[in-house]
Regions:
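Conserved alpha-helical scaffold segments that buttress catalytic/binding sites
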Residues: 1-133, 137, 162-166
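Metal-dependent de-N-acetylase/amidase catalytic core
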Residues: 123-177
Length: 177
């Protein structure tokens, strides 16, 4: 995992991993980094989706992120964005990372084949703007990757994934990066 390498090499002192602001809890990242005090894992997800937390089956068990927020099935834009904003802004202020790694999963979208949240295209776009603007305005570098998203129509999926790139471009222009 690249975040561990960055910490071990001294490239950063503290790293925030927004591994999951999508429909699934970031259990794998939480497990890998659970003993690493210099890393903070944040997950805002649908509480009734994989991984389901079956104890006794380690490969399906939930590992706790440093901050886990499980949302109800069917959560829409307003509640989702409010949760993301509160958690992200609070964590940026309290943990004060040198770098944010953000996995911009789009399986929160209302038309996603496997998601259980109901986030509109506008809500998805606002999430990307919120995450990137929050980091850039605090002068915290952010690295974004696309992830999560299930649709039989590749064009629809690509359109959703493009939201994070549009938000990054807008921040680049706004802040003259």
């Amino acid at each position: 995992m690249r975040s561990k390498v960055l910490l071990e090499e001294g490239a950063v002192d503290r790293i925030l991993i927004c591994d999951d602001l999508d429909v699934h809890q970031g259990d794998g990242t939480a497990e890998i980094l659970r003993q690493e005090a210099r890393a903070f894992t944040l997950s805002v997800h649908c509480k009734d989706n994989f991984p389901f937390g079956f104890k006794g089956m380690a490969h399906l068990g939930k590992d706790r992120s440093d901050l886990d927020v499980g949302l109800e099935k069917g959560t829409g834009d307003e509640a989702f964005l409010s949760s993301v904003s509160e958690c992200l802004l609070g964590t940026l202020d309290d943990f004060r990372p040198d770098l944010v790694l953000y996995d911009a999963g789009v399986d929160v979208h209302e038309d996603d084949d496997l998601g259980n949240l109901c986030i509109s295209w506008e809500g998805l776009r606002k999430r990307e703007d919120l995450v990137i603007q929050a980091c850039v305005s605090k002068r915290i570098p952010i690295a974004c990757v696309i992830g999560g998203g299930y649709d039989r129509d590749a064009r629809h999926l690509a359109h959703r994934h493009a939201a994070v790139h549009r938000a990054a471009h807008d921040a680049w222009r706004t802040y003259r990066l």
